[in-house]
Amino acid sequence: MMKVGLQVLSRTMKSHLEGVPDSLGNMRNQLGMTFFRAYASPEAEYNQGGWHIRFQMPITFTPYYYNDKLMGAKENASKTQVAPQLSVSYFLTARLQATLSGGIAQREVDEQNFYQGLLMRDYRNLYMGFVDYTADKSKHVSFNINYKRPLATIFANAYIRKSWSDSHLTVARDFVGDYIINSYFSNSSSSENLMAGGKVSKGLGFMHGLVSVGFDYLRFDGFLRQNDSPSAYSSDNYMLSAKWSGRPVDWFNFTYELNWDKDKMVLKNLGFDSSSTNLAQNLTFNFQPLKSWFIKLHGEHYRNQIADHQHKNLTLADASTSYGFRNGMELSLTALNLFNQRTYGYTVYSGLTRTSKEYQLRGRTILMSIFFHF
């Protein structure tokens, strides 16, 4: 079997950054990029005796046409890329399946970075692109195992994936006054990525419900240059999730969800490390005392790190009820933010950037509605 196709993209960008010092760099962009990507993906499969083997060989050919009107630069280039992939699955038993897969690839040219003027994405971070058609290389291998026992409503899976990337560009960050200039420079570097995790779920027949627990881990090791100082860096992310739902009686059901995550970032040569821990919980009760009467109670709890060794707890609660009359009229009453919380804060990671934010919340709100159904 073979898949073939053609993808066409044409884009233009015009920007003018104001309000920052001209000494930081070029403030304007006016450019265009067009490419035509032809691809073919031959495939072969084998299914017999519990084995499922699949081989793919995607091939792409892409001519690029780049025009930077401000710089007076026109560049044409073409790339041919091949990305073989192999997946082997085997049913160890009727309920247990294992899959081993791997592949080698050349990443597509990131034409989104083809610009040379500065762009601002938030109040502090400036970004400078880099025009280069060299393709980065990567390879990966993964192992998955799945267990299913439908009659007992037991399901489980686990996975581990390792990937390696070789890049011809290295990320650079320079702190200039109140700003951070993010850019690239031509320098070969490598990075590694490890992902592992699993999930187990079990049906609860006696209460018509389900309970599940999952865990995921992500580690990244890479290289960057910060203020002209090269540094290896790593990031770790741990995520734990749990869910419990049920309907013990016909007129009542509930759902509880918990999500916990911890992020850690280390710049090894610069002696810098930082971490953040966050917790979120949700609990919902639904009641139906009568056929036409519904009651819903919902609560949320957040424990978010807003600075080192500082956390902020936030509890929110909503309640609503509705009643439908025989003549088609429905009366609804909703109370939002019962505890009248006013602020919400948290810390997020994006690549090598850590940002703490705080928002103002709408206070307690009472809503009454009348609906007519015809």
Regions found by a protein language model. Name each.
Residues 1-374:
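Exposed, low-structure sequence patches enriched in small/polar residues
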